[in-house]
């Protein structure tokens, strides 16, 4: 209280882990109008009463308003950073009050504020383009409903952390990808409902994204990460700990070593790529895909009709093309439609089919360089075409 009375020009206040009351914090709202940063994380006694109450006669266009029998409360026009980590007593009402009196906050840390709901996130959305960074990790009650609103209103967010928000789905990540063109970092640790659809949608931000945290998102596959690292050339950090598909030795060799203080279990599931590891992983995945693409045998695919030799590209119908299956699942999603071009070389299905076709023709004595036109005009090729039909029918 003495600090609030005598140090009215404080620019930063850090009371993290202090046994400070809500009454003391409320004094800063009444007197510390020049404060730019406030850190009161892990202050277990702080509740909604720490923040000035809104009234009906309040107007955001005014710099102050009067409350009956209380000192004048002024708007914190210069307040840019608020950290309320683990303030478990605050509710949606506290967030409403903060946003009302500090309408230009850029960085808001609300991790582990377990009582917050979608209502709080919708209040945060009112910050609009002023908001650059938002931490909502372990705020387990929030859903797609509020995150979609946030994504559409706060379009200048550079960093968002949604770790351990179990109710979120692909819908939230798709909206974030579509509406946050400046996004550089995203935390999705243990957001278990997201799938490859979310990962592919993040490729829309290929010019900006630098750090992605996806640990323990067990529905994510290697195919999706292949697309991600191929598209995101600025990516410098990718965490995939706890995802079964990435425990393979051929992928683990590109991971950085786990911290020494980790337990045996943590070391076993640790999978984080950074710096040169990202570059090497990208090269490995591209080379591995090309190798598999070259080694596909026609026995793995069922032939379709020859169509009188006029259809060069539809001799085969893929039955186990993972990349094509991924495209079909994403394209059929009611909330997302992605063009083939988003996948680069990964989904160049025609090349794969043409390669299989040529290998089959070669095995049956027909030149792999023959075009459909040549096949129709050359009698020897016509004979071999009949041999193909015989091969299928025997």
Positions of predicted regions on the chain:
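Conserved nucleotide-sugar donor-binding catalytic segment
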Residues: 14
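C-terminal capping region of solenoid repeat domains
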Residues: 6, 23, 27, 31, ...
């Amino acid at each position: 209280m003495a600090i609030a009375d005598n140090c009215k020009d404080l620019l930063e206040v850090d009371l993290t882990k202090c046994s400070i009351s809500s009454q003391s914090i409320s004094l800063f709202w009444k007197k510390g109008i020049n404060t730019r940063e406030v850190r009161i994380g892990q202050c277990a006694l702080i509740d909604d009463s720490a923040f000035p109450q809104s009234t009906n006669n309040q107007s955001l266009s005014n710099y102050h308003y009067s409350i009956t029998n209380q000192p004048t409360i002024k708007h914190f026009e210069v307040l840019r950073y608020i950290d309320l980590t683990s303030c478990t007593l605050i509710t949606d009402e506290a967030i409403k009050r903060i946003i009302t009196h500090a309408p230009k906050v850029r960085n808001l840390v609300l991790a582990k504020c377990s009582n917050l709901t979608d209502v709080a996130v919708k209040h945060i959305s009112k910050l609009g383009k002023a908001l650059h960074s938002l931490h909502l990790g372990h705020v387990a009650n929030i859903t797609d409903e509020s995150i979609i609103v946030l994504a559409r209103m706060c379009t200048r967010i550079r960093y968002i952390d949604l770790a351990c928000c179990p109710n979120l789905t692909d819908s939230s990540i798709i909206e974030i990808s579509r509406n946050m063109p400046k996004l550089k970092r995203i935390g999705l640790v243990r957001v278990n409902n997201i799938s490859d659809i979310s990962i592919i949608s993040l490729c829309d931000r290929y010019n900006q994204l630098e750090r992605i945290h996806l640990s323990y998102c067990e529905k994510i596959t290697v195919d999706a990460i292949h697309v991600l690292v191929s598209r995101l050339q600025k990516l410098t950090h990718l965490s995939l700990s706890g995802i079964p598909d990435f425990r393979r030795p051929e992928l683990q060799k590109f991971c950085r070593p786990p911290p020494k203080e980790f337990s045996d279990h943590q070391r076993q599931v640790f999978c984080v790529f950074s710096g040169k590891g990202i570059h090497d992983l990208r090269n490995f995945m591209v080379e591995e895909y090309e190798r598999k693409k070259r080694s596909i045998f026609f026995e793995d695919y069922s032939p379709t009709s020859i169509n009188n030799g006029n259809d060069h590209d539809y001799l085969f119908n893929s039955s186990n093309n993972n990349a094509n299956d991924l495209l079909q699942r994403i394209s059929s999603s009611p909330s997302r439609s992605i063009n083939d071009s988003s996948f680069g070389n990964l989904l160049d299905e025609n090349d794969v089919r043409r390669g299989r076709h040529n290998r089959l023709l070669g095995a049956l004595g027909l030149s792999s360089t023959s075009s459909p036109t040549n096949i129709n005009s050359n009698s020897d090729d016509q004979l071999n075409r009949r041999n193909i039909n015989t091969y299928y029918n025997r």
